[in-house]
């Protein structure tokens, strides 16, 4: 009985995570469009038997190019890599869903920005991710603000 509940809960968590990343993608795209005035184009992609995702791209007046991408993938880790990943001791399978945002500005005074987060399930589950800014023209005040945030 507990295995059935656990499996159901795991599948529900996957569904919730996918929907949350989709909603987060829509929020990012809406805000970028509001700032820029341009519109995103969307393209889906699939990887045979291992999942897929949607790429959203905007080229505009404020942003040279923005990509807001979501994906859900599954598969099996190769044996040599499996040892480095938590939760793969009993089974080498993984499932992951996430979002990645990359924004390059028209102005060299505004840093490029990257953000990603993902939900990963092996025999364990966790969220991972990060963010970074890459300035074309270094502004120490911006650097300090970013690192304090």
Name every feature range the model reports, one short phrase each.
Residues 54-129:
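Internal mixed beta-strand/loop scaffold within catalytic domains of large alpha/beta enzymes
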Residues 123-149:
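Compact, glycine/acidic-enriched structural inserts
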Residues 1-2, 55:
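Intrinsically disordered, low-complexity regions
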Residues 9-86:
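Gly/Pro-rich turn-and-neighbor structural signature
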Residues 29, 33-37, 107, 118, ...:
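Hydrophobic/aromatic-lined pockets within catalytic cores
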Residues 28, 85, 99, 146-149:
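Generic structural signal of hydrophobic/aromatic residues within well-ordered alpha-helices
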Residues 2-9:
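Short, charged/polar, low-complexity loop and linker segments
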């Amino acid at each position: 009985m507990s295995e059935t509940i656990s499996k159901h809960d795991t599948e529900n968590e996957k569904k919730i995570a996918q929907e949350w990343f989709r909603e987060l993608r829509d929020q990012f795209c809406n805000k970028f469009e509001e700032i820029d005035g341009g519109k995103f184009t969307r393209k889906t992609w699939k990887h045979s038997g291992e999942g897929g995702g949607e790429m959203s791209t905007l080229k505009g007046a404020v942003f040279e190019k923005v990509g807001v991408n979501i994906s859900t993938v599954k598969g099996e880790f190769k044996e040599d890599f499996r040892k480095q990943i938590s939760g793969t001791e009993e089974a080498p399978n993984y499932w992951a869903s996430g979002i990645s945002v990359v924004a390059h500005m028209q102005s060299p005074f505004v840093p490029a920005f990257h953000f990603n987060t993902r939900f990963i399930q092996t025999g364990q589950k966790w969220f991972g991710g990060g963010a970074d800014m890459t300035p074309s023209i270094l502004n120490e005040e911006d650097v300090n603000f970013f690192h304090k945030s």
